[in-house]
């Protein structure tokens, strides 16, 4: 394969991007491909697919993207670490668009009456929700609320079909996740999502659902009913804010 590569990518959260780089570092370190990715890869750009000048494509093995599916194990480089169970929107490979299969499913298209703009809108919305979901999932891994986070994630039905009920189910679960993290962290995650290109209407929809309209100078959330919610920072929230700021600068 030619040494010149180009990258195509979708939006992912910064922690996920760093995790991917670490796995590439441990498995493909020293290879020409890794060197190029290391020089090109930026925080927030993920779901990598590498395309050579000859239009040959080299997909990053799904196991390196976080999938724990047994079907992916044969494609993994030696020494690939075993990953903990992850929700589908963490491990799903969105590098070619989230709905490659669903677009060819007649029932899915009929659900939206074949309207292309509606399909595109749902693509953006689910991709945006997935990005926020990944950010929250990564952010809460070491927090006391992780058991509750896992319970919520286990209730998510994979919306692989292009249906509004599936999208709404995903949105409801993301809202529940965001309510588990400190207000300051919640706003930082939403701000990062906006910077990642998620449609502003999706962000505003979620922000209104979490009943937060602003954050005052003391870091307290101001709810829509104008009652202030006090929040005593915990060590978890301090560490989390520091980590998010470091990854998104």
Swiss-Prot record:
Q: Where is the composition biased (Low complexity)?
A: 67-77
GO BP, one annotated term: plasmid partitioning
Record carries keyword Methyltransferase: no
| Domain of life (superkingdom) | Eukaryota
Keyword NAD attributed: no
Start-end of Basic residues biased regions? 240-249
UniProt keyword terms in alphabetical order: Plasmid, Plasmid partition
Disordered as annotated region, ranges: 61-86, 217-249
In UniProt terms, what function does this protein have?
Plasmid partition require REP1, REP2, and a cis-acting DNA sequence (known as STB).
Query: What name has this protein been given in UniProt?
Result: Trans-acting factor C
Give the source species: Zygosaccharomyces bailii
Q: What is the lineage of its organism?
A: Eukaryota, Fungi, Dikarya, Ascomycota, Saccharomycotina
């Amino acid at each position: 394969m030619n040494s010149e590569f180009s990258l195509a990518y979708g939006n992912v959260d910064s922690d996920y991007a760093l995790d991917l780089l670490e796995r590439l570092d441990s498995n493909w370190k020293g290879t020409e491909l890794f060197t190029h990715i290391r020089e090109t890869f930026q925080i927030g750009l993920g779901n990598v697919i590498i395309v050579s000048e000859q239009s040959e494509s080299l997909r990053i093995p799904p196991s390196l993207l976080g999938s724990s599916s047994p079907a992916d194990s044969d494609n993994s480089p030696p020494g690939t670490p075993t990953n903990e169970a992850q929700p589908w929107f963490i491990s799903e490979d969105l590098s070619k668009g989230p709905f490659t299969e669903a677009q060819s499913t007649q029932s899915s298209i009929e659900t939206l009456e074949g309207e292309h703009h509606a399909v595109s809108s749902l693509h953006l919305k689910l991709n945006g929700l997935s990005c926020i979901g990944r950010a929250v999932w990564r952010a809460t891994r070491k927090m006391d609320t992780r058991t509750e986070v896992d319970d919520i994630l286990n209730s998510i039905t994979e919306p692989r079909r292009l249906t509004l009920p599936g999208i709404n189910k995903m949105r409801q679960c993301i809202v529940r996740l965001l309510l588990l993290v400190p207000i300051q962290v919640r706003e930082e995650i939403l701000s990062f999502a906006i910077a990642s290109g998620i449609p502003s209407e999706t962000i505003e929809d979620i922000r209104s659902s979490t009943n937060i309209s602003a954050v005052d100078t003391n870091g307290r959330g101001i709810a829509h009913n104008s009652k202030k919610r006090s929040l005593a920072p915990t060590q978890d929230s301090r560490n989390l804010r520091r980590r998010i700021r470091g990854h998104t600068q």
